[in-house]
Amino acid sequence: MKDALVALLSIISFCSRTTAVNASDTGIPQVQVQQEDGKWIISGLKNRIELNPSDLQMTVHAQGQTWTMIASFSGDLAVENSGARLALRLADAGKKEITPYDTGFKTGLKIVLTDFNHKDTRIDLQISLFLCLEGEQEELVCELIAVEKTATVLECFWPQAIAEDSFDSTVVPFMQGMLLPKDWPKKVWLYDTVCYGRGLYMPWWGHQKGKSAVLVLLETPEDAGCSFEHPEGGPTKMELRWIHSLGKLDYPRRVRLCFFQSGNYVDMAKRYRRHVQEIGHFVSLKEKVAGNPLVAKLIGSPVIHTGILSHIQPESSYYHKDDPAKNHQLVTFDKRAEELRQLAKKGIKRAYVHLDGWGFRGYDNLHPDILPPCPEAGGWGGMKRFAETCDQLGFVFAVHDQYRDYYLDAKSYDPNLTILSRNGTRPHGSTWFGGNQSILCSRLALGHVKKNYSSLLAHGVKVRGAYLDVFAVVPPDECYNPDHPATRTDCLKYRGACLDFLRAMGGVASSEEPADWAIPHIDLVHHGPYALAPDPGHGPAMGIPIPLFNLVYHDAILLPWSLGKGAWGIPENELGYLHGLINAGLPYLSLNPGKEELDQVRTMCALNERVGLLEMTRHEFLDGSFRKQRTTFADGTTVTVDFEKETFEISPRLPEIGSEE
């Protein structure tokens, strides 16, 4: 009996020793939740969150920097109840239940909001908000879940915007990227405010204050965006906006706030890069080359953008009433092939050829029923010879195509196949060359892609790739047609399937601009330059241009750049050539280049061949004018550009590049 008692005491002593583990050794966040002076406090070792339960206002104390968010406001919750849209306020919930919340890997608060009312009407809805510190860096993870009963959520602004006195500048992936000082003298607006459009190529933004920074990273971006304001002289207000999906907020929405004691827009971009790598979204060019050797031929190659037939329908806003000859301009396939042969004689040994206007009635006409190839230009035989010429010259031949614009005179047009909006209407426009059009539901696009490219290959046309217009620049669509419903998430899946089909057929996949969702599906884009006022076609830059996109994805996708001054997406009075160099992108090449253009193209190609597969590790401004800048790549290569003096320096220097004419 005595021996048994000794043994039992030994076991108890051993268990006590083994369970006395330091909290820091478990990986469990060392975070405490408590109430203090009427506020809820979430305290970690680095960061402290204060929540005022009366107005849901939050303040974050992050290692010496305070980030204050605005309070709940009227309209931060929009619902539909009995067919009416109602503006509510989260903080006006008749009942707020706030309790500590701990999952073992994140710790904070759960806030359950119920008993909403609008005038004398009770709104049957529950909103649950979660605020937690997570991970060693104690990032603030905010999650919103709606339990919709008789009322549905149309949009919600939460967490609220960071107050203007908490930051000096705002960082936005507005096209390639924008740094916007709070007191910027000119009005700034985003072209669109939904994720995956030009306003937000990538689903994040951030703010800088002195040497500190905060990143707002949307982890569920498909039905999300922002509200953005910057009047003349500022200040800037940028706020997260959650959007319904087919009329409901039907899945949890999550955003992560990352705090940097010492950091700026480069650190934000690198944190986001780590995020897309961790979730498997980042697909490098090296991986794409491994999957398709044709992609390797694009590294260090110029991009030749040319066309066959430009035909403008009378209904189009581009129609030339006073000069009808401009409405139908044709160059044959054979003529274009000869121009490529002459270009090759100037020393161009490889290139990516993007061909517009090859379809039956030319550029932006009759989609998705574009076959047969333009009869006036040579038809099937002419297109086949053009493709063979590209093969012989070592050029990668790809066609321009479109599977969103749905022309009313297309052979397959049926109004029942268009997008149906929530209010029961169908989109209609007549801007583009083909005239009257609607929008094809994304669920139906893949069948047309298969139809057309299978036919091209069956006719012996050696097309090596395709550019599917607008897919990677227009935010995702919704469709409410019960025959082919599609959420925004569905839309992106269907667009991706179209691009993946091209790659499965051995082709290079391309689209218009580099919206983040498309990175795993495409190899290059038409361009990814900067936001200008009043539009990207021409004008001064909005804010200060910075290469946010390339800081994340330079080694995942190829971006071509126009060379001229004030070209599309290039700030007026600045050389596209210098922007192309500092971004180490591909150059555009005209069909009849002079010596200066050829020299510029060869320099850009040589630089891209050196670093095109490498990460852009750094971007920096070298003086207060923001005109002298430097980028650094993973091998140590630096590119320094002075936009004022129109000079550049590449270090280490590129090998001597001589004329090959």
Regions found by a protein language model. Give the residues of each.
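Bacterial N-terminal signal peptides
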Residues: V6-S13
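Short, Gly/Pro- and small/polar-rich lid/capping loops
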Residues: D25-Q30
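Boundary at the C-terminal end of the N-terminal hydrophobic targeting segment
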Residues: T18-A23
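Active-site-proximal substrate-binding groove within the catalytic cores of carbohydrate-active enzymes
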Residues: G44, L246-M268, S316, K321-P324, ...
